[in-house]
Design a protein with these regions (language model features):
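Extracytoplasmic substrate-binding proteins
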Residues: 15-20, 79, 85-146, 163-168, ...
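C-terminal motif of bacterial Sec signal peptides marking the signal peptidase cleavage site
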Residues: 6-8
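Bacterial signal peptide processing site
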Residues: 10-12
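Short secondary-structure boundary segments
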Residues: 25, 85, 143, 170, ...
Length: 248
């Protein structure tokens, strides 16, 4: 598949066609990759497009990279710049932690870029998920021991996959270790535990009792790239989680 000519990282192509698309953030990368027939119009992706959190396919990782820096964005001004909420692009994505925001952003992009909206296809994928016989209680934990309740994209994915979030307090939170150990989930859902980064707040890796708790319960680890910016990767997350639940 042909793409726009490749140049060195951050080096803009002169005389870009007006239909060329420049992504200035990792969030925008993820959304653009979900649009059909868009690859030939991509001129640049975000500075994180080659990172472990990126869903950029290998054959597009050589594309130039850019970001929201005003001066660098001026270099790409002849194309259509897509950014995150408040990013100052020609198209700025909305922020939200639910599937409706994903559909809204896809509609925004499809209408402005004159491409087919993939929302119906993605919604059909969610609708085809097989519910488990019994909805398991699921506890989400990241490396720091933080978790997520109603109103978060993690909660949206758990529900879509047929699970029940054991955390009932809304929003993102960091319960004390004793509270976490006292919970009785059927499954622990984790992400980023296999990352090479090690931090001083990595309770799930550094607290022996919590680590023992995690090891005593079935654990499902989702790739961190699925969660990026609560974008279309949430559909992948829901599918992955649903399949893992059914396999237990």
């Amino acid at each position: 598949m042909a793409v726009l000519p490749l140049f060195a990282c951050g080096s803009p192509q002169t005389n870009l066609p007006k239909t060329a698309i420049i992504s200035t953030t990792l969030c925008a990368d993820g959304y653009l990759h979900s649009l059909p027939g868009i690859e030939t119009r991509l001129a640049a992706l975000s500075w994180q497009s080659r990172s472990g959190l990126s869903q950029t396919p290998q054959h597009l990782r050589a594309l130039p990279q850019t970001d929201n820096d005003l001066e660098r964005r001026l270099n790409w001004s002849s194309g259509i710049q897509v950014s995150s909420a408040g990013g100052g692009g020609d198209i700025d994505l909305k922020w939200g932690e639910d599937f409706q925001t994903v559909w809204d952003n896809l509609d925004l992009l499809a209408s402005n870029l004159n491409v087919t909206d993939p929302a119906a296809t993605l919604q059909a994928r969610l609708g085809s998920l097989k519910p488990p016989t019994t909805s398991p209680l699921i506890l989400y934990l990241d490396r720091s021991g933080a978790t997520a309740g109603p109103g978060t994209f993690v909660d949206a994915v758990i529900n879509a996959a047929g699970g029940t979030n054991i955390i009932k307090t809304a929003g993102w939170q960091s319960p004390d270790t004793e509270t976490l150990i006292g919970l009785q989930p059927d499954i622990i859902l984790s992400s980023f535990l296999d990352s090479n980064y090690v931090g001083v707040n990595d309770r799930t890796l550094r607290h022996a009792a919590l680590e023992d708790k995690i090891r005593s319960i079935p654990q499902i680890n989702l790739p961190g790239r699925y969660w990026t910016c609560a974008g279309p990767g949430l559909i992948d997350a829901a599918e992955h989680l649903n399949q893992a639940i059914l396999a237990l």
